[in-house]
Amino acid sequence: SQLENLVDVKVSFPVGRVQYLALRPCSFYEFLGAIAKNDLLAILSQKPEYTVAFHEQLMHQFNQYAIIGGMPEAIQQYAETKDVVAIEDVYETLVQAYKDDAEKYVVGNKLTDTARFILSYGWAFAGETITLGNFANSGYKSREVGDAFRLLEKAMLLELVYPVSSTQMPVIPETRRMPKLIWFDTGLVNYQAGIRSEIIGSTDMVDAWRGHIAEQITAQELLALEDRVGQHRAFWAKPNNGAEVDFVVSHDSRLYPIEVKSGTNSHLRSLQVFMDSSNVDVAIRIWSKPYSVDEIKTVNGKTFKLVNLPFYLIGRIHDVLNAMV
């Protein structure tokens, strides 16, 4: 059990004899491999421009992945049955196991109650910036909620993604500011928050569930790019300004902004604020439309390239940046 590592017990390990490996939900590309869509995997390995002709097929499969998530058992059952509804029992069993583990291993009744509350109701806040005190009208104090979140974060069930205010490396999270809640698997979020039908019926994932599920799945795909256990995601927010960019990613010792947004380029005010103070000239927008590249000029006159990357190409983001810079 992941939650077994939450017990207040000191365990000694032989120095230099323990190797830590990151075990994460399956990525979209792993999902395609599991359902034998090797033809689409071959297309995704080509230059991004080549994916345009297959855009509808690729987005259909990505929407399926966003609904199902990356839990191996859920994907295996879907691969065998092609029935999205049939995998609900997998989600129910997993979530109940996490709740039982919290009660079994967490020391202290208050911490147990708070952790169980988060595991019951916290899914509805996926992709949102949250306040710890009185989280979800729970009545719990900030410290109690913070302790429970850190406990669940240590178990790799979720991550509190904190903002950075600099547009340069290194990435230093500002932990005194409000974090964004990202759960470890989108399929579980959809099931627990009761929004699967909305995602299934949506024509644009960015617009579904107020855009939060699009941020959640983007964060999940970004984390799948890294194999370091301690890797954390971050977003950018300028203090006292209101400008906020959904995520930032480091590439070749530089920080690149990522917006998850549909619509016209005129709606990218925060991205332009970031670029005006950045030392890069490439920004990324994740959306549901085909791959394209625009040239944008900020209000202050800086020109940069905006790479419009469909969701199914998030896994190629470093390759795309290599080609652009």
Task: Give names to the regions the model predicted.
Residues 218, 222, 245-264, 283:
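Conserved catalytic cores of phosphodiester-cleaving nucleases, focusing on short active-site segments
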Residues 7-124:
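Interdomain motor-coupling "hinge/lid" segment immediately C-terminal to the ATP-binding subdomain
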Residues 19-21, 182, 258, 282-286:
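Hydrophobic/aromatic beta-strand patches that form the interior of the parallel beta-sheet core
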Residues 262-305:
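Catalytic cores of nucleic-acid endonucleases
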Residues 291-325:
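Domain-level recognition of nuclease-like catalytic cores that cleave nucleotide substrates
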Residues 4-9, 29-33, 267-268, 292-297:
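Switch/connector loops and helix/strand junctions flanking conserved nucleotide-binding motifs
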Residues 2-5, 25-29, 165, 188-189, ...:
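Conserved nucleotide-binding/hydrolysis micro-motifs of P-loop NTPases
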Residues 76-249:
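Accessory nucleic acid-recognition modules appended to NTPase machines
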